[in-house]
Amino acid sequence: MQRFFLAVALIAATWLAAVPSPAQAAPCLLVTLTGTMSGPVLLNGVAGAGTLVRYGDDSSDCSTVKLQFDAGRGTALRLSQVDLDVGQLDAIFFTHMHSDHTDGFADLMQVRWNWNSTGPKLDVVCSADAPSPLGFTMSCRNLVVHIGDAFIQSGEIAQRISEDKRRLAGGPAELGHLITFDPRDEAQVVWSKGDVRVSAVRSTHIAGHASYRVDTPAGSVVIGGDAGNDLPAPPRPTSTSAQVEKLAQGVDVIVHSTMHPVVGPDRDSGMPPPVFYRQSATTDLGAMAKRVGAKHLMLTHLASQVGQSRHGP
């Protein structure tokens, strides 16, 4: 059984369910786009990039395991629109350290700290520190360690602890369980729980970028992030990532950011050519999905947004 719907919350979702044997609950995989905005752009209330993956069966409302991939602006609000408390997340995975993929993380962790300080820590899975040849380092570790610094420095953490001593003294960072890995061309398992396994590969966008695959008995999904081809610009056979294509062989669902030709360097779109070329083009993603045999392609991180011909203000 497969069912698709667009919820009132402006969240697109795909539902996959396996056929159960008699007297068994049907395992299911639910993939939800919690935000589809590309870059630090504000337009029509569209939330920042993020994907929620839920796995379970009929008896658990497909919610035994709940995983969030990236957390752009408004993620916690979008989760609330599908009746998911941030304290219920098992893990969050980051594809890379760009603010349009991480803006909502501080909000998510502050809310979890406020209401769930006595609950389990949240697994935060991401690349190890990734030095750039340009002389700086992309650091998910620093993001996690310092996620509550503004709240601590403003005095909010101390004030809220004075009202409820169950809250952790170190603020939201104490609720994060950091799991880092060194991305490689070959897939490696970076997280697992029960029947759910998450693998990762290196992919090209910025230093430390990774793409993920979730495998469950109900189906599989690849989260490409902002991956593009290793060659930074044409001529090249495709704009898509060879590593992501290998990771996605036989997958059920591909979730991937996309660049539409309308914002290409030959248009007056405001999109810098290097930014356009470091991501995957819409038509190339469709061709890749066909090559790997994917059943569904969910386009996200849309540049430009539907109905727009420019990127940004």
Segment roles from a protein language model:
Residues 1-4:
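Positively charged n-region of N-terminal signal peptides that target proteins for export
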Residues 7-17:
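Bacterial N-terminal signal peptides
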Residues 11, 59, 88, 268-269:
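General secondary-structure edge motif
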Residues 24-221, 311-313:
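Binuclear metal-dependent hydrolase catalytic cores
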Residues 71-72, 225-229:
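Switch II (G3) loop of P-loop NTPases
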